[in-house]
Amino acid sequence: MAAKQVLFSDEARAKMLDGVNTLANAVKVTLGPKGRNVVLDKSFGAPTITKDGVSVAKEIELEDKFENMGAQIVKEVASKTADVAGDGTTTATVLAQALLTEGLKAVAAGMNPMDLKRGIDKATAKLVEELKALSKPCSDPKSIEQVGTISANSDATVGKLIADAMAKVGKEGVITVEEGKGFEDELDVVEGMQFDRGYLSPYFATNQENMTTDLENPYILIVDKKISNIRDLLPVLEGVSKSGRALLIIAEDVESEALATLVVNNMRGVVKVCAVKAPGFGDRRKAMLEDIATLTGATFVSEDLSMKLEETNMEHLGTASRVQVTKDNTTIIDGAGEKEAIAKRINVIKANIAEANSDYDREKLQERLAKLSGGVAVIKVGAVTEAEMKEKKDRVDDALHATRAAVEEGIVAGGGVALIRAQKALDGLTGENDDQNHGIALLRKAIEAPLRQIVSNAGGESSVVVNQVKANQGNYGYNAANDTYGDMVEMGILDPTKVTRSALQHAASIAGLMITTEAMVGEIKEAAPAMPMGGGMGGMPGMM
């Protein structure tokens, strides 16, 4: 085991603070409408230019191991806030730095670190209550657009795109962000349920020009096994043929003989049919087939449920107003499933999302939820250069997460104003001793830091602005974009309550841990051995 170096008390905390300051100073320049860009070097390809706080934080590794420990702990604040709220990473970093700087001064002056932490925790709980009280619901398209605009660094086109996407697929719908092909931003919306499996034979195509199959008001058969014998399908095919309607078959697979029979019957016009493979794999496939069955009102034909294909009849088929099948995708629009059954299925998926352990599982469940509850919207980001594309995609992603957070927990006045207004909740709050009272006072001062940083980045005098905002009430604040004061909500400068709350809680939590640190342990780097002396060249004397 390698030898370790141990630092204690003030020396350890000073090193840790140096690391925190290095990381926070790089991150906080991005805050606010006049925040600056940070250029990140990449081991291959062009450097990345970004205004996304968490992207900057993730790139920073310091040479000094003790300073690096401090930087990594604050990096945790940024990434945790991003995970929970999707935005607010820079605000969280600024708050953590402000709290830690003042907290370590207090410890150096002889105050008890544990009491300081208790005071900070007590004040944080009170501030969170006040933020929730200040919060207003965010449900109308205008508020959603404003939140998206602010989070995308005052880019109104991004705010409008997100508001349009939410209006079309609902607040539960899946909205994804992709790199577009052109210079303009685009919004593509897929209504109904779409899955990535196309027809099993191009001979099912009804539109030969663009090779699609359009089925109006079709019956839908959903099976979780391979169909190899056409006899198993005869009762269903006869019933569908008599009705004069089309049939969509979704099965694990349809083997060659059965597929050939279906194709021939389709081409002769005996029965209009299209067969597609079931989406997904394993247990996820069964779950998705059950989703489709619920959406269309079909009975899921599965031997696990004691249902055999040969026993299937017309009663077991579902319907939809329209189905479109291409070589790659199948879209079911306006399924005829019962609203109650669909709502019940949605609640089951929501419960599974809450219990999911991995991001992958959670993402797949979210996709299933969206397909059942509304649809999928894809925002395609356009830009002139690849560097601009990456930077813009990061901003749109942030804005999307912030908007979802706003819909979930509501909105407060932006630009750091909500934290200033929440200060009044600390009036009269006292701890059990003077050191706890100092912890409360520390947080009262630290929550001014985001507003101060926004003003500094805009080239203003932070103390003047903070005093002006404090002297007024309600949503009155400072608009750094055009250097004016006024009602932040009316000016469309809003922050999601969840983002502000998460930033505050994570910053206070990490600062409390770092203030109470008394020792740091790191490995001692072994000096690399000197290079061996080169041997003499053949036929020549050795070099001296």
UniProtKB/Swiss-Prot annotation:
Pfam families in alphabetical order: Cpn60_TCP1
Binding site for ATP: 30-33, 51, 87-91, 415, 479-481, 495
Enzyme class, UniProt record, top EC level: isomerase
InterPro entries: Chaperonin_Cpn60_CS (IPR018370), Cpn60/GroEL (IPR001844), Cpn60/GroEL/TCP-1 (IPR002423), GroEL-like_apical_dom_sf (IPR027409), GROEL-like_equatorial_sf (IPR027413), TCP-1-like_intermed_sf (IPR027410)
Region forming the signal peptide: none
GO cellular component: a single term: cytoplasm
Compartments, as annotated in UniProt: Cytoplasm
Enzyme Commission designation: 5.6.1.7
Keywords: ATP-binding, Chaperone, Cytoplasm, Isomerase, Nucleotide-binding
GO molecular function: ATP binding; ATP-dependent protein folding chaperone; isomerase activity; unfolded protein binding
SUPFAM superfamilies associated with the record: GroEL apical domain-like, GroEL equatorial domain-like, GroEL-intermediate domain like
Gene3D superfamilies on file: GroEL (3.50.7.10), GroEL-like equatorial domain (1.10.560.10), TCP-1-like chaperonin intermediate domain (3.30.260.10)
Transmembrane segments: none
Catalysis performed (reactions): ATP + H2O + a folded polypeptide = ADP + phosphate + an unfolded polypeptide
A GO biological-process term: protein refolding
NCBIfam families, per database record: GroEL, PRK00013.1, PRK12849.1, PRK12850.1, PRK12851.1
PANTHER family to which the protein is assigned, alphabetical: 60 KDA HEAT SHOCK PROTEIN, MITOCHONDRIAL
Assigned protein family: Belongs to the chaperonin (HSP60) family.
Role played: Together with its co-chaperonin GroES, plays an essential role in assisting protein folding. The GroEL-GroES system forms a nano-cage that allows encapsulation of the non-native substrate proteins and provides a physical environment optimized to promote and accelerate protein folding.
Quaternary structure, from the entry: Forms a cylinder of 14 subunits composed of two heptameric rings stacked back-to-back. Interacts with the co-chaperonin GroES.
Protein name: Chaperonin GroEL
